[in-house]
Curated annotation (Swiss-Prot):
Keywords: Acetylation, Citrullination, Coiled coil, Isopeptide bond, Phosphoprotein, Ubl conjugation. This is RRP15-like protein. One of its GO terms (biological process) is maturation of 5.8S rRNA. Pfam families: Rrp15p. InterPro entries: Rrp15 (IPR012459). There is a cross-link at residues 108, 179, 208, 238 (Glycyl lysine isopeptide (Lys-Gly) (interchain with G-Cter in SUMO2)). The modification Phosphoserine is found at residues 58, 67, 206, 265, 279.
């Protein structure tokens, strides 16, 4: 056993680099040898002195081996840390060198914080929105200028007067149209059934005739309204509310002229024939 322990000892003078696996194996072997020696010492009672000396020698050897292993492990850890720090430093240095050696175009700034093109675009869009909003507000103010919401309670009489004026104007317009149509119909009857004379008559009819009729009715209505009493005016307004124009009447399409439209056209043909024979 002593020979086995002596063989397991490590020479302190020769420091060799060992792998962590070998170190673990050496520690296990040393512990196993120590445990065997202790068991033998307990069993054997005769050779205590020799066993104790061997135990002391083995303990010293194991302690020396452990100390050497700890020193070597510390050295290896320091070397690994130095290599890792050197690797990170070299990577950082490479990255910085790449950035510093990079050539930037003259149109773009070298410092990225000074590159404020996006901020300028955002500011420009903001200004455009503000200008559009100002234009819209200005347009609304112009549209709402001099607009006043009518008060139903205060402006009741004024609204009634305006309604009366509007109804009078509409009734007067329809009466003027009716009178103008009557005048045209009378002239057509005077002409007779000749199509040429009718066409000539219709060509002479213009807007001025209608406007003159409308103005004449306006003056006549003013004169008549000035000479009438208030009660007569009210009755006139009520009568004017009814449909005075032919088109607004219920029996407009049922008149005699519309029923006999084909007879009139037949009667016109011989008249044209007579006119032609007279010319010959």
């Amino acid at each position: 056993m002593a020979a086995a322990v002596q063989d397991s000892r490590v020479n302190p003078g020769g420091k060799l680099k060992r792998s962590p696996k070998k170190k673990k194996k050496m520690k296990k072997v040393a512990k196993a040898a120590v445990s065997k020696l202790e068991d033998e010492l307990k069993d054997s009672s005769g050779g205590e002195g020799s066993c104790e000396s061997e135990m002391d020698d083995s303990d010293d050897g194991a302690a020396e081996a452990d100390s050497e292993d700890n020193v070597e492990s510390c050295e290896e850890e320091n070397e690994v840390a130095a290599e890792s720090s050197a690797g990170t430093n070299s990577g950082w240095a490479d990255a910085m060198a790449k950035i510093l050696n990079k050539k930037t175009p003259k149109s773009k700034p070298t410092i990225l914080t000074k590159n404020k093109e996006l901020e300028k675009e955002k500011e420009k869009l903001k200004q455009e929105r503000l200008e559009k909003r100002k234009q819209i507000d200005k347009k609304r103010e112009w549209e709402m200028l001099c607009r006043v919401k009518p008060d139903v309670i205060k402006d009741k009489e004024a609204e009634r007067n305006l309604q009366r004026i509007a109804t009078r104007g509409v009734v007067q317009l329809f009466n003027a149209v009716q009178k103008h149509q009557r005048n045209v119909d009378e002239k057509v009857k005077e002409v007779g059934g000749s199509i040429r004379k009718r066409a000539k008559l219709m060509s002479t009819v213009s807007k001025k005739d209608f406007i003159s009729v409308l103005r004449g009715m306006d003056g006549a209505s003013e004169n008549s309204s000035a000479g009438k009493s208030p009660k007569a005016r009210q009755t006139e307004v009520k009568s004017e509310e009814g449909p005075g124009w032919k088109i607004l009447r219920d029996d407009f399409m049922m008149g005699a002229s519309m029923k006999d439209w084909d007879k009139e056209s037949e009667g016109e043909e011989p008249a044209d024939g007579q006119a032609g024979s007279a010319s010959h």
